[in-house]
Amino acid sequence: MQQPSSVIIVGAGLVGSLWAVFLARRGYQVKVYERRPDMRAAGYRGGRSINLAMSERGWKAVEMAGIREQLSKTALPMPGRMMHAVTGDLTFQPYGKEGEAIYSVSRGGLNLALLEIADRFPNVEFFFEHRCVDVDLDLPYITFENMQTGDTHQVEAPLIFGTDGAFSAVRYALQKTDRFQYTQFYLDHGYKELTIPPAADGGYRMDPKALHIWPRGNFMLIALPNADRSFTCTLFLPFEGEVSFEHLKSDADVTAFFRRFFPDTLDLMPTLLEDFKNNPTSSLITVKCRPWQWQNRILLLGDAAHAIVPFYGQGMNAGFEDCTILDGLHDQFGGDWSKIIPHFAAQRVADGDAIAELAQRNFIEMRDLVADPKFLLRKKIAAHLHAQHPDFLPVYSMVTFSNTPYHIALKEDDAQNRLFAQILNLPGIEENWMENPEVERIIRGER
């Protein structure tokens, strides 16, 4: 069977632009269509997206694409969380072992860099302000509207990759097919992006070697460092309720809210009121669907296939891992897309569902449990067990610092939750958890 030499990518976001690099390196003629204007010319504005945390899966993908060195220059290591109590007390919680860290990267900056890298390949062509209006499911064609002129044109498309996000036009076409399963779920919480600018002397106003979290039970504030010495902050808060966005209408409301719940931030955020007014309040969606492919010639990747909430820092990493796995299958099946695509779609969907569930669970951990003494004790015991039993890997480390399939990490999370339910119920465990024979017995029994 003759394999296509040209491919269409719908969506020039993070996953689409990275996948264009992978395909270009293999010699394909790649056409990338994007609904939005070229962000390199239009300029990138924040306010809609959350700073990203690059971890092992993401780094592996950019390494395989040959672009790690270019992208690592502005990535800032965060070896742990810095917890901010209402009293102003700070507690540092390492993410993993010595030397392990996640990396703060700007979504816009990363997307700009990937576009630049992809555009250097002579066999990659970008078409901006082109909206996908129809995907022919019977014949290899796709139709785009030029949003500047209003003209539509049909493009031959023997191979289509839908990387056009949570509200994917390519997926929408597949949703019309028989037995296509699709669910979407919105959190009751929204988010708003805020800023801590550099200090007057040009330095950071807080420790840049941490992801800062202000956990407040049903809501939280987080802050990630940027290379320009600022922090990108994100407030996660219910849309409605006693403490919610609906009650933050005036400058006085916002100031009183921050003074009550995040008092140590007021001096750090001179543009708080301006940011709060000007930046949108955005929603948080989870998307699950199956199958991710159609007739071995149309494939969904990234958020188009598996949009998740951001609380495990894995949305981008999962999308980049899609590229890694697909590229490996290209080698395994000798470039035969009739085998690559169905194999990928069948193998990967369980991982998409699993990281969606893990991200939901981590939301509860970040906003609430991180301030709970029992949870902090669990973290200490888990780190100790990992040191004593190297095969015991905390689930966070499994997800963040390894390439363990997400569905395996989810099973391990269930197992470790059962294990720690027993350990934390042991009498006097708070004072006697190191070298405790009962803990060892439970570990041996559970494992």
Language model feature labels by segment:
Residues 116, 121, 130-134, 139-284, ...:
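Conserved FAD-binding catalytic core of PHBH/FMO-like flavoproteins
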Residues 4, 328-447:
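C-terminal helical "tail/cap" subdomain of flavin- and related membrane-associated enzymes
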Residues 9-25, 194, 280-371, 390, ...:
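Conserved mid-domain beta->alpha element of the FAD-binding
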Residues 24-47:
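Glycine-rich FAD pyrophosphate-binding loop
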Residues 15, 38, 167:
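Conserved Rossmann-like nucleotide-cofactor binding loop
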